[in-house]
């Protein structure tokens, strides 16, 4: 088992939150300004931070971990916590919540008619997953998927959070900037727009361009996406990191001077460098400027009273949770008094198993029924008209070591007709020779009229098993 020194970890976790507070407070006054800026210092009075939803949402995710435990948190839990604890309806936040309220579960909640799914709302809240999985980026990235898909579906906003979460988790055990960026890139598709924008930033720096020209090239490539979008703003973080040349202040000032979603770029780069350097190494005057307090803006305080009041409080709560998360994921990482042991950067990159998992996530809805798991995917969407025939792709996974037969019943919406669909399947176990996975297609036809919400259920009964699979099906008229 690899060891991370407990005191060093505490300093890095605290550095993450203080760094985020510094960067968010530095960048917030310039948020939304798209022109090239010349930021030289804070615009606020010293002693308190500005509130920032980038941090607020992570306090809710910590509550979910504390309430449900490391293995109980998934996109369904986080979706329900969105509705209960996060009031704002800004951009993708509002669309994701509205879609869930109409019955669309994640990741459909983040995909359906969401013009903001490529935006910045997810990657700005990835640090909680990294801090709870230090040196274990694969686990961090799976949590990031559960998080991001709620309001970004399979958009670039989700890929952006996979990138930052993996990079930040790895930063607890690897401090080399270039290696960390490559680790982050390994967790997202090479052809996605986030990866392309990051590569433009890397190429500009490598080829000796100044940061302003590199920024211009990033903006030119992302012009079709518009403002407040993840690819360009993640690249601004990378520009600040590259051209800051190891200097905390210069790095954040450069990132914020790129403009656009400046509180997000400053806060995320501040947290990354806070993890790498630790809180003790951050500039004393900037730490003093923001203090230790957490001021919230996006949490329903009437529903939750035990909110961390300071970065110290937050760090202590994270430190209590982290050993549980690492153990739950069989990470092979322990936290103790000995020195932090070096880790080969190659071992931090995405595995083939992770990449296969990411491909299977796609935009299918996941259901876990203990002995089996079911994924439901609507290849032609969820909108349906009277008389229209629509396919549903079903994948069933065996989660236990025995094979089993499943009897399938379809309880369709009124007037709907089953055109195609298995009534029985033999779900084998995964032995290396046989696969514990079964895929099939269901086709339904709507009746002469449809309702606004057309709800059905696919029931699967496993012989000799008490748990009945009840997977909801929904079409919108």
Annotate each predicted stretch with a short phrase.
Residues 447-477:
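Terminal connector regions
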Residues 402-415:
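Short acidic, flexible loop segments centered on an aromatic residue
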Residues 428-430, 443-451:
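Short, surface-exposed loop/turn segments at beta-strand-coil junctions that are enriched for proline
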Residues 386-400:
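Short beta-strand elements of extracellular/lumenal beta-sandwich folds
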Residues 22, 26, 37, 164, ...:
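Catalytic phosphate/nucleotide-handling subdomain of diverse soluble enzymes
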Residues 9, 100, 108-117, 128-136, ...:
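Accessory "access/gating" subregions that flank catalytic or transport cores
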Residues 45-61, 67, 294-326:
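A structural-propensity feature for long, helix-poor, extended segments
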Residues 2-63, 77-78:
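An N-terminal structural lobe/cap that precedes and organizes the functional/catalytic core
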């Amino acid at each position: 088992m690899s060891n991370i020194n407990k005191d060093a970890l505490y300093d890095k976790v605290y550095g993450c939150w203080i760094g985020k507070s510094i960067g968010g407070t530095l960048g917030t006054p310039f948020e939304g300004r798209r022109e090239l800026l010349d930021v030289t210092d804070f615009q606020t009075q010293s002693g308190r931070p500005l509130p920032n939803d980038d941090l607020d949402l992570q306090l809710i995710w910590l509550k979910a971990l504390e309430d449900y435990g490391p293995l109980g948190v998934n996109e369904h839990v986080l979706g329900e916590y969105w509705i209960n604890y996060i009031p704002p309806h800004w951009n993708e936040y509002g669309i994701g919540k509205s879609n869930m309220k109409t019955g669309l579960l994640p990741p459909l909640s983040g995909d359906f008619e969401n013009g903001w799914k490529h935006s910045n709302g997810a990657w700005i809240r990835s640090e909680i997953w990294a801090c709870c999985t230090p040196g274990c980026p694969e686990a961090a990235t799976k949590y990031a998927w559960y998080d991001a898909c709620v309001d970004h579906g399979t958009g670039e906003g989700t890929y952006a959070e996979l990138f930052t979460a993996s990079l930040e988790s790895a930063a607890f055990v690897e401090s080399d900037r270039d290696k960390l960026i490559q680790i982050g890139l390994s967790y997202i598709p090479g052809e996605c727009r986030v990866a392309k924008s990051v590569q433009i930033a890397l190429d500009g720096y490598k080829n000796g361009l100044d940061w302003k020209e590199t920024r211009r090239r990033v903006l030119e490539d992302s012009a079709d996406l518009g403002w407040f979008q993840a690819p360009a703003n993640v690249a601004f973080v990378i520009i600040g990191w590259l051209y800051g040349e190891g200097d905390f202040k210069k790095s954040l000032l450069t990132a914020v001077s790129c403009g656009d979603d400046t509180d997000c770029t400053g806060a995320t780069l501040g947290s990354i460098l806070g993890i790498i350097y630790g809180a003790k190494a951050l500039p004393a005057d900037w730490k003093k400027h923001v203090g230790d307090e957490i001021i919230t803006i996006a949490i329903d305080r009437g529903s939750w009273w035990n909110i961390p009041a300071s970065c110290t409080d937050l760090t202590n709560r994270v430190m209590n949770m982290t050993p549980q998360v690492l153990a739950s994921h069989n990470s092979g990482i322990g936290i103790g008094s000995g020195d932090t042991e070096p880790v080969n950067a190659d071992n931090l990159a995405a595995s083939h198993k992770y990449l296969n998992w990411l491909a299977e996530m796609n935009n299918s809805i996941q259901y876990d029924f203990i002995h089996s798991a079911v994924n439901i995917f609507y290849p032609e969407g969820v909108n349906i008209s009277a008389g229209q025939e629509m396919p549903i792709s079903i994948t069933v996974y065996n989660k236990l070591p025995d094979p089993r037969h499943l009897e399938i019943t379809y309880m369709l919406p009124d007037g709907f007709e089953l055109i195609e669909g298995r009534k029985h399947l033999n779900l084998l176990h995964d032995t290396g020779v046989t696969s514990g996975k079964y895929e099939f297609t269901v086709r339904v036809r709507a009746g002469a009229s449809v309702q606004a919400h057309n709800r059905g259920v696919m029931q699967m009964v496993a012989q000799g098993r008490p748990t009945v699979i009840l997977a909801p099906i929904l079409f919108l008229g």
